[in-house]
From Swiss-Prot:
Regulates the transcription of the pyrimidine nucleotide (pyr) operon in response to exogenous pyrimidines. Also displays a weak uracil phosphoribosyltransferase activity which is not physiologically significant. It catalyses: UMP + diphosphate = 5-phospho-alpha-D-ribose 1-diphosphate + uracil. NCBIfam families: PRK05205.1-5. The keyword Coiled coil does not apply. The lineage of its organism: Bacteria, Pseudomonadati, Pseudomonadota, Gammaproteobacteria, Pasteurellales. This is Bifunctional protein PyrR.
Amino acid sequence: MEKIIIDAEQFQRTISRISHQIIEKHSSLDNLVLVGIKRRGAEIAEMLQSRIAELAQTELPLMALDITFYRDDLHLDHQDPVYTGVESQIDITGKNVILIDDVLFTGRTIRAALDALLDFGRATRIELVILVDRGHRELPIRADYVGKNIPTARTEQVQVRTQFYDGMNQVVLIRAKDE
């Protein structure tokens, strides 16, 4: 069973609110770099980049990060992993990085992303943007900017759908069939 928990209008308002929060928190945007975790985190990063440009008249550098080979669960996947590379590689040394992903669950994706970021330099600071925080952390990771906190059961799934990949912007909660 599927339940829409963020519709298209709420999705855009959430992107706008997070953009405002980023601008308010940083006295200057000159040293900021947006890094989106592929796939949907990268698309959300593009949305934030666009909205921040509208609000602050400045376009932040953007990098899409593939964390495939940094994951700690590669041995569980029986398919050969496909690395899609990094788009617009940026040296993040001395930069304030805003790391962006769609859903925060166990924290393992973010840990992998932090490991991957080290290959691009030593950032001054890394902040985390998450569209949906669903809880159930296995690692001590906390987001600096959260679109929406959605308490879930471990058996449920939170699926972020974006225009590029899914033809719409929304977030749905998918319950297991036996619940």
